[in-house]
Regions:
Chain A
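Short, low-complexity disordered leader/linker segments with a strong preference
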Residues: 1-29, 318
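Immediate post-signal peptide segment of exported/extracytoplasmic ligand-binding proteins
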Residues: 22-34, 62, 83-89, 141-152, ...
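N-terminal (or domain-start) structured segment
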Residues: 24-112, 150, 157, 161, ...
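Hinge/capping helix and adjacent helix->loop/strand transition within the periplasmic-binding protein
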Residues: 30, 82-88, 101-186, 247-280
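Short coil/turn segments
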Residues: 39-41, 95, 129-134, 155-160, ...
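A ligand-binding cleft/hinge motif common to bilobed small-molecule-binding domains
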Residues: 95-105, 162-171, 197-230, 308
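C-terminal lobe and pocket-closing loops
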Residues: 121, 205-273, 302-305
Length: 318, 498
C-alpha cells in the first residue's frame, strides 16, 4: 500500500512538472524579471520600472525589476547571459553595455544578447555655465581650436559621458582636457564651482538648471530636437555630427526564441498610443524611442561599432 | 523657529500623512533592528509603492523608513552585538558589552535619546542653514575631499592605539580589500581573478554580516555562553540626566561630524559613526574604557549616524546631489513625479520642501517614543534560548546579504568574512580599523586621483589651497599625537609589568 502511494505521488510529481512545461509553451505564464543594470532610484531604474509596469498591464503577468548595479552593470549582464532563454529573465540597459565591452570591463559582447526593443531615449546635452562667453557650439569649437587642451570637460572615466566627450572631440576636431568629475550631480557642482568649463547633462536636468538661470545648453546630441526642450538646438543643426543618446534597450539572453521576442516587442509597440505611458516617460526626462526587433538589432550593432571606433581612436580599447 | 513650526503644523494637520510617516517609522525601526536589513533596503522596497501616491505622501512613508532605519540599528547592536545596519557598527563596540554587563536598558535608552538628538538637530540645521552649507560645498574640489579623507584615515591610528601593529595591519587589510573591483578612475579591473561578481567589489553589507552576525552567532553557539542576567526595569529616562551634561562636548562634536560627513556626497551614516567613535575615543580621558561598555562610545556613534540624515538631505534638496545611498533613492522617488531637486525646488515646491522638514522632525519624535515604549520588550530578546534565536538570525543574515544586491555571490562573501572575523579574533586583530580602511580607502583613492587629473599631476595644490593645507596639518597633528599616545601607553604597560 505504501509503495503504491509512493509511486502514485511520484507520478503526480512528474505530471506536475510536465504540466509546468506545457504551461511554459504559452508565454508568458509566470513572473518576468527585468534585470536593471543600475541602482534603484536613478533615471535608468525609473525608466525600467515604468516599462515593467506597462508590460505587466499588457502581458497580464507580474513583471518585476531586479537592480544589479554591480560592476557598472557587468553583474546584471552576466546574470542575463547565464539565464535560461525562456523570456523570464530580461536585461534593461543602454549605451553603457557597449562601453563596458570595449573598455574591457566585461568580456562578453552585447551582440551576444538577443535584442528585443528599444524603449525610451534620454537625450544628452553639452552644457556650460551661464557665465561662459560661449553662446553656441561653434563659439566653443572656435575657441577650443585656438586653445587646444585648455578647456576642461567633466566626465566619468569609462562611462557613457566619457564617450560623449570623445564624440565631441572627434566630430569637432578639437582637444579638450577630460577630467573625471563623477556622476551627473557632482559634475553640476564642479561646473558651478568653476572647476569645469563643460559638462554633459541630460535634457531633463539641463532644463531645470537653464530655467534657474545658472546653465547654458550649447547642443543636444541628437538628430532632432527633444520634445521636452524644443528650445535647445541640436549639434547636427549646428553642423556637427554628434549623435549620442542613451537609448534604453531591452535584451533577452542569447538564443531567446523569436516568438517570445515578438510577444514582448508587440506589447511595447502598443504603448505609443498610451498617453499615460508617454507622460510618465516625460516626467523623468525620457522620450518615446521604440524600435522593432529588426531595427533594434541594426541599431545595437551600429552603436556597438561606433563606440568601438571611438575607443580605438582614443586608445581606450582593451 | 517659525519655519519648522509651520512645517510641523502642516504635517500634523494631515492625518493620512501622519499615518504614513508612523507606518514608515515602524517599518524603518524593524528594518534597522534586523541585522542585514537596512534603511536603504527598506526605502528601496517601499519606493515603488510611492509611485502611486502624491510626492508629499510618498515622502512621508520614505522619510519615516529612513529615520526609523538609521535609528533602529542600535537595537540589534546593543542586544546582540550585531549592527542592525552599517550605520551602527561603532555602536556594537560599547553598547553590546554594556548590555552583557546586565544594563541593556541603559544602553538602549542612550541609543534612543542620542538618535533623537541627532535627527532633530540635523533637521534644524537643514531648515536654517542648508543654503549656506551648500554654497561651501561648491567651493570644495577633489583636493579638499582627498585631504579630508586622508585626515579621516589617520583615525585608524587612534582605533589601533592599544595594539599598534595589529591595528594598523587590520587597517591596511581593509584598504587592500577596498581596492577589489573596478578602479575608481581609469576603470581597470583589480584583483577580480576573472570573476565577474568581483568586478562589483566586495559588498560592505555582506562583509559586515559575516564579520559580526555569522561570526558572533557561530562563536557564541560554540562557546555556549550563558544567558546574561538582565535588569529590565526602566526608571525615568533609563540613564542619569547628568550624563548628557558630562557628554555635552562629545555629543556636539559627534553631531558636527555626522552632519558634515552626511553632507559630503557619497558618504553617509555608515562612515559617520566610525569617525565619531574614533574621535570620541581619541579625545576621551579614559580611552582604555572604550570597547568595554563606555557610554561615551554609544553617544558618539548614535548621535553622529542620525545627524548624517539631515546632513545628507542638505545637498539633495538644495543641489540635487544625494549625500548617501538613501537620499539617492529619495531623489528617485521625487524624480518619478517629475520633480527634479535642485536650486528650483525651494521656489517651485515650497509645500513639498516644508513637509519634508516637518516629516523629518516628526519621524524623530515618533522613533523616540516607539523606542521608549519598546524598552521593556526589546531586552527580552536576550532571554530567548539561543537554539531558537540563532537560526532566525542566521536566515535573516542570508536574506540581508542577498537583498542589498539581489546577488547570491554575496553569500560567499559573507561566509568568507565570518571566517576572516574568527581568524582576526584569534590573532587579536581589531575589526574597526579594517572596516574604516575598507570604506575610506576607495574614497581617498578616487578623490586623490581625480585631484591629480585636475592639476595635471602636480601635488602642489594640496599645500597651496588653504582648506586642503589646514586639513593636511590636522592629519599630521593627529598622526603625531597618536604616536605619542601610543608610546605613552606602551611605556605605561611596560611600567605595569615591571
Amino acid at each position: 500500500m505504501r509503495r503504491l502511494l509512493a509511486s502514485l505521488l511520484t507520478v503526480i510529481l512528474i505530471l506536475s512538472f510536465s504540466w509546468s512545461l506545457v504551461g511554459a509553451a504559452e508565454y508568458p505564464s509566470s513572473t518576468i524579471k527585468i534585470m536593471v543594470a543600475a541602482k534603484a532610484g536613478g533615471a535608468t531604474d525609473a525608466s525600467g520600472r515604468i516599462v515593467a509596469q506597462f508590460l505587466r498591464e499588457q502581458l497580464g503577468v507580474p513583471v518585476v525589476v531586479v537592480n544589479q548595479e554591480g560592476g557598472g552593470g557587468a553583474v546584471a549582464t552576466d546574470s542575463t547571459i547565464n539565464a535560461k532563454p525562456d523570456g523570464y529573465t530580461l536585461l534593461y540597459d543602454h549605451v553603457n553595455a557597449h562601453v563596458r565591452y570595449h573598455t574591457g570591463l566585461y568580456g562578453v559582447s552585447p551582440l551576444e544578447l538577443t535584442p528585443i526593443a528599444t524603449t525610451a531615449a534620454v537625450n544628452q546635452t553639452i552644457a556650460t555655465d551661464k557665465a561662459s562667453p560661449w553662446q553656441t557650439l561653434d563659439d566653443l569649437v572656435q575657441d577650443a581650436r585656438a586653445n587646444p587642451k585648455k578647456y576642461a570637460f567633466g566626465m566619468q572615466t569609462g562611462a557613457s559621458s566619457h564617450f560623449l566627450s570623445l564624440a565631441l572631440m572627434d566630430a569637432a576636431d578639437i582637444e579638450l582636457r577630460l577630467l573625471d568629475a563623477g556622476f551627473e550631480a557632482d559634475k553640476l557642482a564642479a561646473l558651478r564651482g568653476g572647476q569645469l568649463n563643460l559638462i554633459q547633462a541630460t535634457v531633463g536636468a539641463a532644463r531645470e538648471y537653464v530655467e534657474a538661470g545658472i546653465m547654458r545648453v550649447l547642443a543636444v546630441c541628437a538628430t532632432e530636437r527633444d520634445p521636452l526642450a524644443p528650445d535647445f538646438p541640436t549639434a547636427v543643426e549646428q553642423g556637427y555630427d554628434i549623435v549620442f543618446q542613451s537609448m534604453h534597450t531591452l535584451y533577452g539572453p542569447p538564443g531567446l526564441p523569436d516568438e517570445i521576442v515578438k510577444v514582448i516587442s508587440d506589447a511595447l509597440a502598443k504603448l505609443e498610443d498610451d498617453p499615460e505611458y508617454i507622460e510618465k516617460l516625460h516626467k523623468i526626462g525620457h522620450v518615446w524611442g521604440y524600435r522593432n526587433p529588426e531595427d533594434t538589432k541594426a541599431f545595437v550593432r551600429n552603436e556597438f561599432e561606433r563606440i568601438g571606433r571611438l575607443a580605438e581612436k582614443f586608445g581606450l580599447k582593451k | 523657529m517659525l519655519v519648522l513650526a509651520q512645517a510641523l503644523q502642516m504635517v500634523i494637520q494631515q492625518p493620512f500623512m501622519m499615518v504614513l510617516v508612523l507606518m514608515g517609522a515602524v517599518i524603518g525601526l524593524v528594518f534597522g533592528a534586523i541585522p542585514g536589513l537596512t534603511a536603504t533596503t527598506g526605502v528601496a522596497l517601499a519606493l515603488p509603492l510611492t509611485f502611486a501616491l502624491n510626492p508629499e505622501m510618498g515622502m512621508a512613508l520614505l522619510i519615516g523608513i529612513y529615520v526609523g532605519g538609521i535609528s533602529g540599528g542600535f537595537i540589534a547592536a546593543t542586544l546582540l552585538g550585531i549592527p542592525g545596519t552599517p550605520a551602527s557598527i561603532a555602536t556594537c563596540f560599547d553598547a553590546y558589552p554594556l548590555s552583557q554587563q546586565g544594563q541593556p536598558v541603559k544602553a538602549l535608552a542612550i541609543g534612543a535619546t542620542a538618535s533623537f538628538m541627532g535627527t532633530l538637530g540635523s533637521t534644524i540645521c537643514l531648515v536654517y542653514i542648508a543654503p549656506i552649507i551648500a554654497n561651501i560645498a561648491l567651493k570644495l574640489s577633489p583636493f579638499e575631499y582627498s585631504t579630508l579623507m586622508f585626515c579621516a584615515l589617520t583615525l585608524i591610528a587612534t582605533l589601533a592605539r592599544e595594539e599598534p601593529f595589529r591595528g594598523l595591519a587590520s587597517g591596511f587589510l581593509g584598504i587592500l580589500l577596498g581596492s577589489i573591483g573596478i578602479a575608481p578612475i581609469g576603470s581597470t579591473l583589480r584583483f577580480t581573478f576573472g570573476l565577474v561578481p568581483l568586478s562589483a567589489g566586495l559588498n560592505l553589507l555582506a562583509m559586515i554580516l559575516g564579520i559580526f552576525a555569522i561570526k558572533q552567532i557561530s562563536v557564541d553557539y560554540a562557546e555556549d555562553k550563558p544567558i546574561p542576567l538582565v535588569d529590565l526595569e526602566v526608571k525615568g529616562l533609563g540613564f542619569r540626566l547628568g550624563e548628557i551634561v558630562d557628554n555635552a562636548w562629545n555629543i556636539v562634536r559627534s553631531f558636527l561630524i555626522g552632519l558634515w560627513i552626511g553632507f559630503l556626497p557619497g558618504m553617509g551614516a555608515g562612515l559617520a559613526n566610525l569617525i565619531a567613535y574614533a574621535q570620541a575615543k581619541s579625545s576621551s580621558k579614559h580611552p582604555e574604557k572604550f570597547g568595554k561598555g563606555a557610554p561615551e562610545g554609544i553617544w558618539a556613534s548614535e548621535v553622529s549616524n542620525n545627524a548624517a540624515i539631515g546632513g545628507a538631505m542638505i545637498p539633495m534638496l538644495t543641489l540635487g546631489i544625494p549625500g548617501d545611498s538613501v537620499t539617492a533613492l529619495l531623489l528617485g522617488g521625487l524624480m518619478i513625479h517629475g520633480l527634479i531637486p535642485g536650486p528650483l525646488l525651494y521656489i517651485k515646491q515650497p509645500r513639498l520642501v516644508n513637509s519634508i522638514f516637518g516629516l523629518l522632525a516628526i519621524s524623530a519624535v515618533i522613533c523616540l517614543v516607539l523606542c521608549y515604549l519598546g524598552m521593556r520588550l526589546f531586552p527580552r530578546v536576550l532571554t530567548i534560548p539561543r537554539h531558537y534565536l540563532y537560526p532566525v538570525l542566521m536566515v535573516l543574515s542570508f536574506v540581508g546579504s542577498f537583498a542589498s544586491n539581489n546577488y547570491s555571490f554575496d553569500f560567499w562573501i559573507m561566509l568568507l568574512f565570518a571566517l576572516v572575523g574568527m581568524l582576526m579574533d584569534m590573532a587579536k586583530m581589531p575589526m574597526s580599523p579594517m572596516i574604516l580602511g575598507f570604506i575610506l580607502g576607495p574614497m581617498l583613492e578616487e578623490n586623490l586621483r581625480r585631484a591629480l587629473t585636475y592639476s595635471a599631476g602636480s601635488w602642489l595644490p594640496f599645500i597651496t589651497r588653504p582648506v586642503s593645507a589646514v586639513l593636511l596639518a590636522i592629519a599630521v597633528f593627529s598622526l603625531v599625537n597618536s604616536v605619542i599616545k601610543m608610546r605613552r601607553h606602551q611605556a605605561l604597560q611596560a611600567g605595569k609589568s615591571a
